A protein has these predicted regions:
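Short, contiguous, well-structured surface segments enriched in hydrophobic/aromatic residues
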Residues: 1-114, 132, 169
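Single-residue recognition of alpha-helix boundary sites
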Residues: 32, 138-139
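Intrinsically disordered, low-complexity regions
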Residues: 51, 55, 67, 128, ...
Length: 171
């Protein structure tokens, strides 16, 4: 039945999206920790200055989320990047990731151009939207056709590199 297939697809998409989000956060933290010019605080100050609505959104999150203690504490003391990535939404994190990448010569079109579509499908899966039903719906924004690039990127993820079933999961 279509609804069962759709539920299974959403479950897989969400699992993959959470892994991608985690991998991006770990990768960004690794790059920042190796960058002697970055202390972890200046980046967040610059990010908040460029996107002034984000600190306001985080303050609002302090009143109705699981991360209220961290948001309240960091709002008073000042955010370091390792604190900020724990409370930013995926969309906000994408903005931070792109900002750091662009300003530190780490811009990668293959990754950065896929972040918004990845966020969109992640949100659709997380909000239990019917995904199979919309596969043929024409969208005004062009969809990326980067199958080889995605496969190459995924093949470099250590946890998936060792997996014998990676090829079948990508097929």
């Amino acid at each position: 039945e279509l609804s069962i297939l759709d539920a299974l697809l959403r479950k897989q998409i969400l699992a993959i999206a959470l892994d991608v989000e985690h991998f991006l956060k770990v990768g960004l933290m690794a790059e920042i920790s190796q960058n002697d010019a970055e202390d972890g605080y200046a980046l967040v100050q610059h990010f908040f200055a460029k996107y002034p609505r984000i600190p306001q959104e985080l303050r609002a999150k302090a009143h109705n989320s699981y991360c209220n203690d961290l948001v309240t504490k960091m709002d008073a003391e000042g955010y370091a990047v390792w604190n900020a990535i724990e409370v930013l939404s995926f969309g906000q994190f994408i903005q931070l990731y792109k900002l750091y990448s662009a300003e530190n010569g780490r811009w990668n079109n293959r990754i950065c151009n896929l972040l918004i579509p990845a966020k969109s499908i992640r949100n659709a899966a997380a909000h239990n939207n019917c995904i199979l039903n919309s596969l043929q719906t024409p969208y005004s924004t062009p969809k990326p056709n980067m199958t080889r690039q995605i496969e190459s990127f995924v093949s470099r993820v250590p946890e998936l590199k060792k997996s014998k079933s990676r090829k079948t999961k990508l097929a």
